[in-house]
């Protein structure tokens, strides 16, 4: 069912190719990256997005720097490498997968150097680690969906029918190496006959639900209906939502998690209406160094996103050009609102 979905990123002939998601759903085009800065720009500008996918891309950014941009003087390598890794990890601060993947690549490089293998071998180690990061991401996402099936089956059996699921933003194949996190749950549930349809929040201000999730589900043949974010309460009040599943960009030790702005009010609505609310994420999204959501740094984005609507031709101004804007990219959902966290190791209760 997923054969029509494009690869979010892949490595070929010494270059990283990133699906430019800014151009979806109108055009599927790839960016060819041979420099770390090109990857960083793609992450910052949302050409590639989603916590696991930007982790994958970040690992390749480290490898590209080692392969193509390292200083000619090998004695200057370590200091320059450490500085560049810090810059790559800081491109989007809320999603922990980016800093996690960069740290893993950095460790592989430093291990090769410590073993006396030299800078070229260390660069090769970075590339191997980037490949492994992508492969692990795909395997983890597939497992998330497989291990969610007992929970979906129990909910469907309780209701006596397949489930109507609501999701927010894009925690899909487009946000990962493949399968997605929340959509892996949806795809596996749909194939098993446990899901009837999906309600897709448009997800203002950048419209990841409207532009990406709706398109992705349609490509996969999963019935879906697009709704504005402020329609969720009416849907639940009418008894049209049986469960909610979203992704996550960072999960704290206590289960609080950051996800796309608008997730928190959706969780509050779900609790009020007795609708079970889940997040889905790989272990790489957990940041157990943070005690709670109060410790999460929230990225603030360009006011243009709120003043405008994103169209096929770019951003079109719809509000006064000088109106003051508050534009956090994420909000934090308290763990008390969660029915569970779907992971590649099974469901976690918090």
PLM regions and their residue ranges:
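Long amphipathic alpha-helical segments
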Residues: 7-116
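Histidine-anchored nucleotide/phosphate-binding helix
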Residues: 180-191, 267
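Generic structural signal for well-ordered, non-membrane alpha-helical segments
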Residues: 32, 36-39, 51, 55, ...
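Short, hydrophobic/aliphatic alpha-helical segments
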Residues: 31-47, 163-167, 310-322
């Amino acid at each position: 069912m997923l054969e029509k979905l494009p690869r979010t990123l892949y490595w070929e002939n010494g270059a990283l190719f990133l699906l430019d998601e800014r151009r979806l759903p109108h055009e599927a085009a790839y960016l060819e990256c041979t420099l770390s800065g090109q990857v960083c720009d793609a992450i910052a500008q949302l050409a590639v997005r989603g916590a696991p996918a930007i982790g994958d891309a970040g690992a390749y950014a480290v490898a590209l720097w080692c392969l193509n941009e390292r200083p000619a003087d090998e004695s200057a390598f370590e200091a320059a490498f450490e500085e560049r890794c810090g810059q790559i990890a800081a491109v989007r601060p809320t999603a922990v997968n980016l800093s996690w993947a960069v740290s893993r690549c950095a460790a592989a490089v430093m291990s090769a150097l410590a073993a006396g293998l030299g800078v070229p071998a260390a660069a090769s180690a970075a590339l191997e680690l980037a490949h492994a990061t992508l492969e692990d991401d795909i395997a983890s996402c597939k497992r998330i969906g497989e291990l969610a099936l007992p929970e979906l089956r129990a909910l469907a059996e309780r209701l006596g029918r397949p489930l109507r699921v609501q999701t927010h933003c894009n925690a899909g194949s487009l946000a990962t190496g493949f399968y997605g996190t929340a959509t892996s749950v949806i795809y596996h549930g749909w194939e098993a006959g446990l899901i009837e349809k999906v309600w897709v929040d448009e997800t203002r201000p950048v419209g990841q639900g409207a532009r990406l999730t709706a398109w992705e589900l349609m490509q996969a043949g999963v019935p879906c209906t697009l709704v504005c974010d402020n329609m969720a309460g009416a849907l639940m009040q009418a008894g049209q939502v049986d469960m909610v599943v979203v992704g996550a960009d960072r999960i704290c030790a206590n289960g609080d998690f950051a996800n796309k702005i608008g997730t928190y009010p959706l969780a509050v609505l779900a609790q009020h209406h007795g609708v079970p609310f889940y997040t889905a994420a790989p272990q790489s999204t957990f940041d157990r160094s943070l005690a709670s959501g109060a410790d999460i740094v929230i990225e603030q984005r360009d006011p243009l996103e709120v003043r405008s609507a994103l169209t096929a031709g770019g951003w079109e101004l719809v509000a006064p050009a000088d109106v003051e804007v508050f534009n956090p990219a994420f909000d934090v959902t308290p763990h008390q609102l969660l029915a569970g966290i779907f992971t590649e190791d099974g469901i976690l209760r918090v």
